[in-house]
Amino acid sequence: MRRLCGARIAAVLVQPADAGLAMSETRDHSWIGICLILAVMLQTIPAFSQEVRDQGSNAGEDFFRPPTNLFQLNTQYRTAPGSGPNGTIVNVTTGTIDFRYDHALDLAPMWILALRSDLPVLAKNPFSSDNPDRNYLYGVGDADVQAVLIHDLSQRLAVGFGARLIAPTGGDTFGSGKWQVMPIVGARYALWEISPSSYLEPFLRYDASFAGDPTRKNISNLQIAPTLNIGLPDEWYVSFYPSADIRINFGDPITGQTGRLFLPFDFRVGRKLDDGAALSFELGVPIIKDYPVYNIKTQVRFNQTF
C-alpha cells in the first residue's frame, strides 16, 4: 500500500499541466488525500499501542501492564492449620522466599504475551513421624511457569487469559506432590476519575491437579481476586485484594476444613522507589475460614524492572 501510494503521488507531481486532464487530476488529488489518510492511520496504530503500554508502565504491580523485564524478591510469612500428633490440629508456620522473573513480548499492536516463572524456597515446621519435635525444615517448593495473552481493547479497557503450570518439585514436605494446571482469565478497567494510576482489575484462576503422587490430596479450587488499585500521591498506592486469596474448594478437604469458602480481608500498600524499583507490604487475615487457607499472611515484595 505504501509503494502504491508513493508511485501514485510521484506520477501526479511529474505529469504536465493540461486543461484536458482536469478530470484525471481530480482523481489523482483524491488518491493523494486517501494516501495521506492511510499514512496517518499506519503511523497512529503503533503509536496508540505504545501509548497504551507506556500509560500503564509500572514497577510490576499491574498484571495487565507488564514491564518488559521484572525481577521480584517476595518474602512471605503465613500460618495455617496442619496435622498434629494423635489427630490433633496444630498451627504450621511457613516462611517463603520466592524468586520470580517476568518477561513481556509485544506480539502486535495492542497484543502482549506476559511470561512468568517462580522458584520458591521454604522454611516450615510441620509435624510428622520424621519430625515429631516440629523443627524447621528447609527446601525448595513447587516451581511454576505462566503465560498470559493480554489484549488492549482501548486505553481504558484490557482483557487477558492464560495458564500456569505447577511442577511438584517440593516433594512431600514442601509441595503438594501433584502436577497442577491453573487457567487464568481477567480484565482491567482504568479509573482515571480517581487518579491516573487507579484501576479495577478482577481475575479468576482455577487450580486443578492432574497427575503426581496418588496418595496426596487432589486439588480443585476456584481462586478469585477482585483487585482494586488506588494510586496515591508521591508514587504511593494501595490495593485491595491484590492476590487471588478468595477460594472456593471443590477438591479433597484439607486439615481443619468445615466448608468450601475462604474469604479474607487482603490489602497491599506500596511505593515506587524510582523508575525501575518498588517496595510493598501485604497483609491478609481471614473473615470466613471454612476452608482454612491461612490464619494470617504477610508479604514484603521488592520489584526491579529493566
Regions of interest found by a model, annotated:
Residues 33-44:
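Bacterial N-terminal signal peptides
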Residues 25, 47-48:
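A secondary-structure micro-motif
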Residues 5, 9, 22-34:
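Bacterial N-terminal signal peptides that target proteins for export
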Residues 49-212, 218-306:
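Transmembrane beta-barrel domains of Gram-negative outer membranes and organellar outer membranes
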